[in-house]
Curated annotation (Swiss-Prot):
Organism, as annotated: Pseudomonas syringae pv. syringae (strain B728a)
UniProt KW Ribosomal protein keyword: no
Enzyme kind, highest EC tier: lyase
Gene designation: trpA
Pathways involved: Amino-acid biosynthesis; L-tryptophan biosynthesis; L-tryptophan from chorismate: step 5/5
The protein, known as: Tryptophan synthase alpha chain
Length: 269
């Protein structure tokens, strides 16, 4: 059983959803980002998505685009992102880490080398936002063969005809993008999410995590009553962007994480 499978199974027995947190690797600098990464589990993160900075983050809104630029300006590379995971794993062998980003840096790195180093570092899953199922076998097949889950995105525009193709060979969990658009967009209604999750459950037994637009403990709790996972990203990135110092960035992210975690944990009480 993979770390992701184990974590979602564990939380199912506890009767609650997972808090899935996103930060961009290397934002605002390597050392600060690593401290945030290491602090997230104790603050309540159940699964961590770690963004791989790329020069053309077309699926991301302004907040994450700026986070990517800060990280790249500070010297972050894909190799350093894998190094961050390795350093995280020294003290934490249980919290799943999912790398999220675009295919171009992986292609340039070399798929075989990337998969091997990601596995060695302790990466548990991949979300590659610009690789549709028709074109992802070059990465998905070797990743899954090595034990790294390949997590695909579904959206409000993914109809029943296409959904089986998107879910085919998916593993880890399904990421439902609740709002069509870029990251940080407005949140969907609970009625819409309820209907979407019911439709997804007719097609898959995988855990379903819902993201895009969730920023407050109240919003997190509302989604946690419906989904297996609640994904929060832009709200954390905004805390880093507005911080007056690295210490304030770390404190801001971890304080928000704790509040969101309480919202998720209280949702089904």
């Amino acid at each position: 059983m993979s770390r992701l499978e184990h974590r979602f199974a564990q939380l199912k027995t506890e009767g609650r959803a997972a808090l899935v947190t996103f930060i961009t690797a290397g934002d605002p600098g390597y050392d600060t980002s690593l401290k945030v990464l290491k602090g997230l589990p104790a603050a309540g993160a159940d699964v961590i998505e770690l963004g791989m900075p790329f020069t053309d983050p077309m699926a991301d809104g302004v907040a994450i685009q700026l986070a990517t630029l800060r990280a790249l300006d500070a010297g972050q590379t894909l190799q350093k992102t894998l190094q961050m995971v390795s350093e995280f794993r020294v003290d934490d062998q249980t919290t799943p880490i999912v790398l999220m980003g675009y295919y171009n840096p992986i292609h340039r790195f070399g798929v075989e080398a990337f998969v091997a180093q990601a596995k060695e570092a302790g990466v548990d899953g991949l979300i590659i936002v610009d690789l549709p199922p028709e074109h992802d076998a070059e990465l998905a097949t070797p990743a899954q063969a090595s034990g790294i889950d390949f997590i695909r995105l579904t959206t409000p525009t993914t109809d029943d005809a296409r959904l089986p193709r998107v879910l085919e060979r998916s593993s880890g969990f399904v990421y439902y993008v609740s709002v069509a658009g870029v990251t940080g967009a407005g949140s969907a209604t609970t009625e819409h999410v309820t209907e979407a999750i019911a439709r997804l459950r007719r097609h898959t037994d995988l855990p379903i995590s819902v993201g895009f637009g969730i920023r407050t403990p109240e919003q997190a709790a509302a989604i946690a009553r419906l989904a297996d996972g609640v994904v929060v990203g832009s709200a954390f990135v905004d805390k880093i962007a507005s911080a007056e110092s690295p210490e304030h960035a770390i404190d801001g992210v971890l304080t928000l994480c704790a509040a969101l975690a309480e919202g998720v944990r209280s949702a089904r009480r």
